[in-house]
Amino acid sequence: MKALLLTFGLSLLAALQAQAFPTTEENQDVSGTWYLKAAAWDKEIPDKKFGSVSVTPMKIKTLEGGNLQVKFTVLIAGRCKEMSTVLEKTDEPAKYTAYSGKQVLYIIPSSVEDHYIFYYEGKIHRHHFQIAKLVGRDPEINQEALEDFQSVVRAGGLNPDNIFIPKQSETCPLGSN
């Protein structure tokens, strides 16, 4: 469960083969506030594992050198926990790494304005994982963006039946219920 929680909470994103994704822009601006609208894993996750999961908006800040700092708070089993990580820019457009290269991610523009798909893979505690996440500038689910996300999930070899839509929360005071 810890590996699964860490995987979910970090929201870092990674790689499929480049031909499976749309062309990415060299200077895309992803700084600002983003809402996690949907996520899909390469493993089946029982509904009960995330039945009580709630997420706050992600804050992404562009750092010196093009790296990104990602922060948000997640409510799990009645407790709020702050998550934060730095995504290190690579020479390849829209490709980042985290945790000393153990996780690789791509930030892919959706065909729907103000939406991106974060796709990542890596290892946590010797367990390999792949995750795709749909994020947008507002908390409302956009059906067109969700359909685009489902197409990318399929193209990446993930099962669209494993898509999870988290509960949105504007705030989650640390340590609170």
Swiss-Prot record:
A GO BP entry: sensory perception of taste
Gene3D superfamilies on file: 2.40.128.20
Superkingdom of source: Eukaryota
Subcellular location as annotated: Secreted
A family per Pfam: Lipocalin
UniProt-recorded name of the protein: von Ebner gland protein 1
Leader sequence residues: 1-18
Originating species: Rattus norvegicus (Rat)
Gene Ontology cellular-component terms listed: extracellular space
Subunit structure: Homodimer.
Keywords, sorted A to Z: Disulfide bond, Secreted, Sensory transduction, Signal, Taste, Transport
Protein family according to the UniProt entry: Belongs to the calycin superfamily. Lipocalin family.
Any one GO molecular function term: identical protein binding
Keyword Signal among UniProt keywords: yes
Disulfide bonds: 80-172
Job description of the protein: Could play a role in taste reception. Could be necessary for the concentration and delivery of sapid molecules in the gustatory system.
